[in-house]
Amino acid sequence: MSGPLSDATHGQPASAQTPPGRAASGRVAPEQAASARVVIAPDKFKGSLSAEEVAAHLARGLAAAVPGVVTDEIPVADGGDGTVDAALAAGYRRIDVEVSGPTGEPVTAAFALRGDVAGIAVAQACGLSRLPDGRLRPLTATSYGAGELLVAAANAGARHIVLGLGGSATTDGGSGLITALGGRLLDAAGRPLEPGGAALAGLRELDLTGRRDLSRLDVLLASDVDNPLLGPDGAAAIYGPQKGASAADIPVLEQGLARWAEVAETALDGDFRDLRGAGAAGGLGFAALAFLGAWMQPGIEVVLELVSFGARAAGASLVITGEGSLDKQTLRGKAPAGVALAARLASPGTPVVAVAGSCTLDEASLARAGIAGAYALSAVEPDLALSMTNAGPLLEKLAAQVAADWLRPLPDAPSA
C-alpha cells in the first residue's frame, strides 16, 4: 500500500514486522489465537466518548469476535483533564474535595491517590468545563482551586504529585495557585489583588511569609506545551484566544504576566519566565516551576508511567490505541504515538494499531510513529454527526475488523 491512507482504506493495516509467534501476515499464529492478550490503551474521542468508554467498546467488540481473548483496558491521557480518570481506571482511589472554580464559585473536584502518589488535573478545578454556563472569562479566571487541590492531596498523604496541565480556563500565571498556598499578591496600597490575569498589572509586592511549606512534595508536570510564559509564543498570545481573550485582551494579559514574572523574580531571586513549559495552563506551569520546584515531562509519558503501562503491555499479542483524530498533531507526542513508543520498549515485536474518528496520516507517517495499522470510524460512517453519536457501536465494528486482521487464526496450509 502506498500514498495517503484515505478514510476508505483505513480498515487495512499498514505493514508490520513479524514478531515471534506470528504468521508472516502479522496475525497471531493458529496455535496462539485462543490465548491472545490484547492491551487497549486509547485516549478520549473528544466530544463523543471518554477514554474509558472507548476502551470498553473496543474490548466488547474483540470479545464478540474472538471468544476467549483476554483484554486489559488502560485508558490514557496526554496530561489533560483525563489524567485523573486514567489513574482511577488503573486502581487509584478517588478523593472528592470542594475547591474554588475558575470564577471563585465552589465546585467538587476529584484527584486520584494510591499510596503517596497523587494524580491531579488542574482542569478539575479551573478547567473550561468548570465555567458557569460555559461563559469564558479570560481576564478574571483564577487558578486558586488548583492550589487547593495540591493542599488537599498533601493533606491526604501524597508526596509525589502528577499534575496534568491541560484544559485550563485561566491565564493568571498560576498566581491564584500561589495565593491558595498562602502567598499574598498586593497592590501599591498594600491591598490584595483581585483574581485573574488582568489584575496582575497592578502587582507591587509578593508576600510569601505565610506560604504553606510544600518542599517535601515532588511535583511532576504532565504537559506537551513547551511555550515560555511571555512573548509571541507565550501563554497569552498562543492560548489566550482559546480561553476567550480578544485581540484587545491579549496585551492586557501579557502586561499582567510580565509584571507577575518581574515580581516573582525579585521574590525568588531567579528568572523562570523562559523555562520550557512556563506558558502551560495559562502560565500555571511558570508558578509550579518557579515556586514548587516542579519538573516537566511529556504528558503521555507521565500518564503511562502512572498506570504502569510498560509492565502491563509486556508480552501482549496486540496493543490497540487511538484518539478522536489521527493527524500531524498525533506525531508530536499525543497519546497514540506515546503508547506505540512505550509498547515498543516494553514488548518489542508486538504490533500496535490505532483506531480514530478520522485519519489523515499516510502509511509512512504511521510507520514512523510505530503504528502498524489505522482504523477510522469515518470509513464505516462518513457522516460526522452520526459517527460521533454512534461512536460506541462503530468502535465495536472496528474492533471486529482489527480482530479479523490481527487475531484470527490463519487457515492451515494445504498438505503437500
Where are these regions (language model features)?
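Long, intrinsically disordered low-complexity tandem-repeat segments
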Residues: 12-34
